[in-house]
C-alpha cells in the first residue's frame, strides 16, 4: 500500500476531501447519508474499511468533552488531542465485547456544531500495511 496511487473523493454536501487507495472500492450506498462515504478492500478474510462522515454536535461539546465521550463509547486505548481535532484508536468492540484482531483509528475534526470524522478499521496483523492510510488520516484537514 506504500506505493499505490491515491484517489481523492470530494463530498458534495460538505466539500471535504478524503484520499483513499486506488484499489479500494467505494460503497455506493454510503452516498445515501448526507456527508458520508465508505471505501473498502476485501480479500479472503482480510477487510480494510475507510469511512468519513459528518455528525452534529447537539450538546455543544468542547473538544475535551467529546474526546472523553467518544473514547468511552469506542473503548479507545489511545487518545491524542490537537488544535481543533482529536484522534482515538484501539480494538473494535461489539455489544458482546472486543472483536478479536480488529482495530480502529479515527480522527474527529471540530467545525462549529459539527464533527467531521474519518475512520479506518483493519485487521491487527495489517497494522504495518495500513500505516500510509493512518498517516493520511493524521494529515487530514477538512478545508
Question: Residue ranges of each PLM-predicted region?
Answer:
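Hydrophobic beta-strand residues in large extracellular and virion-surface proteins
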Residues: 9, 18, 39-41, 49-54, ...
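Secretory pathway targeting signatures of secreted, lumenal, and periplasmic proteins
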Residues: 12-62, 93-97
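Surface-exposed amphipathic alpha-helical segments
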Residues: 22-26, 115-143
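Sec/Tat-exported extracytoplasmic proteins
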Residues: 28, 71-74, 141
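Short, hydrophobic/aromatic-rich segments at coil-to-beta transitions
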Residues: 2-8, 36-38, 81-91
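Signature of long, low-cysteine stretches enriched in small and polar/charged residues
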Residues: 63-121
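Residues that act as N-cap/strand-start positions at coil-to-secondary-structure junctions
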Residues: 3, 12, 33-35, 72-73, ...
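Short amphipathic alpha-helical segments
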Residues: 58-66, 129-132
Amino acid at each position: 500500500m506504500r506505493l499505490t496511487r491515491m484517489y481523492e473523493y470530494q463530498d458534495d454536501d460538505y466539500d471535504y476531501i478524503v484520499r483513499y487507495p486506488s484499489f479500494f472500492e467505494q460503497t455506493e450506498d454510503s452516498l445515501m447519508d448526507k456527508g458520508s462515504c465508505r471505501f473498502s478492500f476485501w480479500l479472503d478474510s482480510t477487510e480494510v474499511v475507510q469511512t468519513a462522515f459528518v455528525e452534529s454536535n447537539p450538546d455543544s461539546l468542547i473538544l475535551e468533552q467529546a474526546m472523553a465521550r467518544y473514547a468511552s463509547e469506542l473503548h479507545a486505548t489511545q487518545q491524542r488531542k490537537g488544535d481543533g481535532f482529536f484522534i482515538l484508536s484501539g480494538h473494535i468492540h461489539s455489544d458482546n465485547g472486543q472483536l478479536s484482531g480488529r482495530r480502529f483509528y479515527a480522527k474527529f475534526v471540530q467545525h462549529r456544531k459539527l464533527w467531521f470524522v474519518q475512520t479506518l478499521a483493519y485487521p491487527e496483523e495489517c497494522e504495518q500495511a495500513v500505516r500510509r492510510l493512518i498517516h493520511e488520516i493524521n494529515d487530514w484537514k477538512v478545508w
